[in-house]
Amino acid sequence: MVLDGNSIINRAYYGVRPLTTRDGFFTHAIFGFLTMLGRLLDEEKPEALCVAFDRREPTFRHLEYEGYKATRHAMPEELAMQIPVLKDVLDAMNIPRYELAGFEADDLIGTISRKCESAGWDCVVATGDKDSLQLVTEHTTVKLISTRMGQTTTKDMTPESFREVYGFAPIHIVDLKALMGDASDNIPGVPGVGEKTAMALIQKYQSIDEIYRLLPDIEAKPNVIKKLTEGEESARQSFHLATIVTDAPLEFSPQDNLRKAPSDALYPLFMKLEFTKLIDKYGLKPPADIPAAEEPVDLTVTAEAVTTVEKAKEYLSLFRKAEHVTLLALPDLSGVIVDFVAGESTAVSAEFYFSRYEGDWNALLRALFSDDIKKVSHNVKDLQRTLLENDLPIEGFIFDTALAGYLLDATAGKYDIASLFAACFHQTLAEPKHLDPDAFSMLGDTAEAETAFHVYTSAVDALYEAFAPELEKRELHELYYEVELPLCAVLARMEHAGMRVDANALAAFGSEMEVQLKTLEQHIYEESGGPFNINSPKQLGEVLFERLQLPHGKKTKTGWSTNADVLEKLRWENPIVEEVLQYRQYAKFRSTYCDGLLKVIAPDGRIHTSFQMTVTATGRLSSTEPNLQNIPTRTQLGSEFRRMFVPADGCVLVDADYSQIELRLLAHIADDEAMKQAFLTGEDIHTVTAAQVFGVPTDQVTKQMRSHAKAVNFGIVYGISAFSLAQDIGVPVYEAKEYIETYFERFPGIRRYMDEVVAQAKERGYVETLMHRRRALPELAASNFNTRSFGERVARNMPIQGTAADVIKLAMVRVDERLHKENLKAKLILQVHDELIVECPEEEKEMVARLLTEEMEGAVHLSVPLTAEAHWGINWLEAK
């Protein structure tokens, strides 16, 4: 198999979202190329493999025709810089590559394919360039690679499949280009002859030689014959330019390209590029005989198993004296490894296992997790929840390496110990089959597992030593130590507390949904003329657009599109559409919320969600297993559903949320006087915006005007386009565009902020919140317009949304501290974006409501007031 190197890396560059290393080097084209290479190897399993590349020098085609490829744009710098590195990677993978001055990669591929055939080998050409189709024979298959909407597909072109598409033999693709030309290569063809005419001529006459032999007696319109006659010289030259050379002076033998194992040089290259997933995929290990670029981190320690109470007391005394200890625990708390420095610099590791300890295991754990031992760990929140579930203290944690890694790079995606260690130190950690490095689950009492457990604990300590000063350097220490780290304990307590659900009411609600679904189902069958599977998009599309002949149908490869956007446009065309939309809504509620939540109610009658701290790039918390943050609020069904969430007996729920926090932050960050004034005077911001945009006094603002202004306000924060705004509020695009332009005229500070934050992000390579949370934006350096536009939208939005996330987190820490300080029985149990829910005894409700508003409003001090409102009730709906 021979790969068209330039074609594939070019497609990877434009088809893969920009990726960079921590020092800013772009890697997405290389990563995309290697991903495609892996797929091709899995599909074809070739015995021999090589890659062909273009060279920078002019080829014989440039010398013969000055205009050859003259219209092509220069290669983007961020792509050009990756090609030499890709070649280094291929060399390290022991994959031969070919280049030849004066010839293109296509010519080398053509020559290689013919040499393979002569040697009795079949050849597969992998490329995204259709020029190579002329090489298709019984023994050479062209595997065409195409990328659409981020999805890569391949199609094998054989003589048979080619003829099915084109209607002539593969070799005559050159004749086709001789007539119609090739805009991408600036090959002229015959002026005035397009693809349709050229295709018809070649299908009938096969070649330009035959066409010109029969001129002027061919079957064609007189003007076509005239163009062919006048353009013969151009056709002949175009034929020559489009013909791939198959006898280039290239030394090649299939036997010299047999596949080999990667060399030791591949591991450090992948480490440098931060391709940790590919290191795992290829099973690479650090080369023993090649010195690392940096001094490797020594993870060896002097270890001792602690089995007696006396020895445990001795170690606990040492732990209390140490500046810090680094600790990892198994999920069931049956084993704990503690690393610490004894004396001057000696690293010591103490291992505690329940099965080997002769004393009171619970008392030992209580001592280990008390406040007088300062602990560094990984995924502290999860460990704290486990401790709470075992009625153990959760104090003394001074650092969480997972959280630190996330703050230092919020777009890395993986924050397990092995990934962070690889990215930080360019070393991989062994992952024995007996150890799950993400959860640290022992799958057997083995020496191998114990050794790995020690290694991972030492790795966490090394990460702590690397991350702590880096947080200080990037001005992230306050956010980390005052918000993120203390939030771990807050969330652990919230998860442990859970939220009570009225299971009987929820089951009854589900039964009611089932009745509604049956009723809707019968109505839909009556309207459509018979039963069908309403949940099948294919069958639904056939009913709506074929049987009922509704307008505006859009066909896809799998049938008619019946997504929400399509159905919304048809809502008034036929009653069946409204009923289908209702059916989908009820079905979603029943399966996701009724049936789904009933399954996860714990024996204590409560749902214990898990809050994820390292998932979103903006810093927002997310909720899983189950997700309690996505329960709909804008529909009657969603509102009714909140009735199912109730407090413990004798308690109420107190719900407090911020009022328009993102708009208030926008006013502060953008320093727009008009918007700030509206908040300072307590005016309704949407009414003020409507008055500004529509040019009317505030007392003349209609309900619709305010609604449109609200959409504009929140749309601006998220970088909405005129097209999207038009769809949201149901106006023409030009009208939506006028709204946005008028908005920026009336609030010039917002426009200035939007421009300045993008310019600053392009200069720095990142944006940040008021509390210095960063998000890297390699997308801003992309040459692809859509990718770059995405980066600009994120640059405008992230400082606002990210600061809102920081503020609510800080508010949670303050609320939790205050509840404990005032010895209240109230418990913070849920956070949903800008909303906090507390469960408290009836007699504490007023105090808790006041406490919530005070701590939320006092979390940060802005140039505009930050306001929060609190309400209480006997269920979540009433409290809201």
Label every PLM stretch briefly.
Residues 99, 149-155, 159-177, 295-301, ...:
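Active-site-proximal helix-loop-helix substrate-binding element of RNase H-like nuclease domains
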Residues 231-356, 378, 420, 442-633, ...:
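Conserved "right-hand" nucleotidyltransferase catalytic core of DNA-directed polymerases
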Residues 515-522, 526-578, 745-793, 797-799, ...:
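C-terminal polymerase-core module
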Residues 496, 594, 604, 608-609, ...:
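Conserved catalytic core of nucleic-acid polymerases
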Residues 19-21, 70-250:
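Extended two-metal-dependent nuclease catalytic cores across DNA- and RNA-processing enzymes
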Residues 471-483, 487, 807, 811-832, ...:
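Active-site palm subdomain of RNA-directed nucleic acid polymerases
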Residues 337-342, 375, 408, 415-431, ...:
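Function-dense linear segments that define catalytic or interfacial modules
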Residues 1, 11-50, 66-67, 71-78, ...:
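Conserved RNase H-like, two-metal-ion catalytic cores of nucleic-acid enzymes
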